């Protein structure tokens, strides 16, 4: 029975050791090969192999995975911050930030084209300003001439209107000279006729006006039959 228990104990103690060594080594080798491929550095995988070899006894002796990961991370950290890798990173950054030749030429052409368009737009704007100023001056001149012509025509029309005989019967006031002449005449019995000429006898339909129909009828009767003295 002791031998049986010894067989099981030996098999149980040996199986985990073999299971722990091979997957860890394969995992580390895969990670280092991927890092070497990314950095494009052929010599990058050499220290990784030594790290794997040095890490295997620690795994077999029962050392924790935390020590190995710290060592690996420390080595990678030192390599990443080394002088050679720092210069390579700066050179790679310069290559990435450097503008391609085609884009640089296109940018220069665009800048030149925009400058030409800006200059052409300024010239066109100046031409439009001069044209607008000239058109405005011509319009003002035509407008002033038209106003003078309208004034002359209105004077002629007013003079002809006031000279017609029935100007006062169609609802307009006669000319000032005729009104003054009639006012100076002292014809007996025509006083109410002159008063009636100053009144508007047309009926008003607006509700805001006062009712003056009675006064209108009185004035009309006085015009027709003046008071006898």
Swiss-Prot record:
One of its GO terms (cellular component) is cytosol. InterPro entries: Clathrin_L-chain (IPR000996). Disulfide bonds join 199-209. It is found in: Cytoplasmic vesicle membrane; Membrane, Coated pit. It is a peripheral membrane protein. The modification N6-acetyllysine is found at residue 204. Residues 93-155 are annotated as: Involved in binding clathrin heavy chain. GO terms for molecular function: peptide binding; structural molecule activity. Signal peptide: none annotated. The keyword Phosphoprotein applies. Keywords: Acetylation, Calcium, Coated pit, Cytoplasmic vesicle, Disulfide bond, Membrane, Phosphoprotein. Residues 1-70 are annotated as: Disordered. The gene is Cltb. This is Clathrin light chain B. Coiled coil: none annotated. The modification Phosphothreonine is found at residue 187. The keyword Phosphoprotein applies. Clathrin coats are formed from molecules containing 3 heavy chains and 3 light chains. Interacts (via N-terminus) with HIP1. Interacts with HIP1R. Clathrin is the major protein of the polyhedral coat of coated pits and vesicles. GO terms for biological process: intracellular protein transport; synaptic vesicle endocytosis. The modification Phosphoserine is found at residues 11, 13, 217. Residues 1-17, 45-58 have a biased composition (Low complexity). Belongs to the clathrin light chain family.
